[in-house]
A protein has these predicted regions:
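Class I S-adenosyl-L-methionine
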Residues: 144-185
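A short, conserved alpha-helix within the catalytic core of class I
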Residues: 98-111
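Short, glycine-/aromatic-enriched active-site segment of Class I SAM-dependent methyltransferases
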Residues: 125-137
Length: 185
């Protein structure tokens, strides 16, 4: 199990690259005709998306009440309630320490331009081969197969995902999806 110190530093070696990609992805998705609405379901101690609040709506969430988030709920519960209340977001960012899988089914239903998913579960899955099959339907932990798993899963909800960018760092990786709904095709 990762120590708290390791968890807090997991972004250290790639944080600037991650933030630069977030900037580029937002510019890629953004249209000037309306305000962008962003959900950061796991915002952490330094919520990245809050710097974009001018001219946009940013909803931050983290279970840790000491963190400067607007809400403090388990992300999977929050995303489920947002779906049930028919909220929609232009961008949904799922960046947990582990896997975003618990949020995916509802997150895909509430985002209409971009979905960002970070996976930090590689270390745990390497030591337990059955987890790759249970979580992602593949025999071994293979990022590209996991991406395909989520693309297929999104289709079940009538949503087409197209990979905009996929990046890997040591035991963590992140995928940026352009969301193609019938209204955006």
């Amino acid at each position: 199990m990762l120590s708290l110190e390791q968890k807090m530093d997991y972004n250290k070696g790639h944080i600037e690259e991650k933030y630069n990609l977030n900037d580029k992805f937002l510019k890629y998705l953004e249209k000037e005709d309306r305000v962008m609405i962003i959900l950061d379901a796991y915002s952490g101690s330094k919520p990245f998306w809050t710097k974009y609040e001018k001219g946009r709506v940013v909803l931050t969430n983290d279970t840790n009440k000491d963190y400067p988030a607007k809400l403090h709920f388990p992300a999977e519960d929050l995303v489920k309630v947002l779906y049930e209340k028919e909220y929609e977001f232009d961008v949904v960012d799922l960046d947990p320490f582990n896997t975003p899988m618990k949020c995916f089914d509802n997150a895909i239903k509430i985002c209409n331009r971009g979905l960002i998913m970070t996976f930090g579960d590689k270390r745990g899955i390497i030591s337990n081969k059955n987890l790759a099959k249970e979580r992602y339907g593949c025999r071994v932990y293979d990022e590209r197969k996991i991406i395909q798993h989520y693309i297929r899963r999104a289709k079940k909800f009538g949503v087409k995902l197209r990979v905009w960018k996929f990046v890997k760092w040591k035991m963590t990786w992140r995928v940026y999806f352009k969301v193609l709904t019938p209204s955006s095709l």
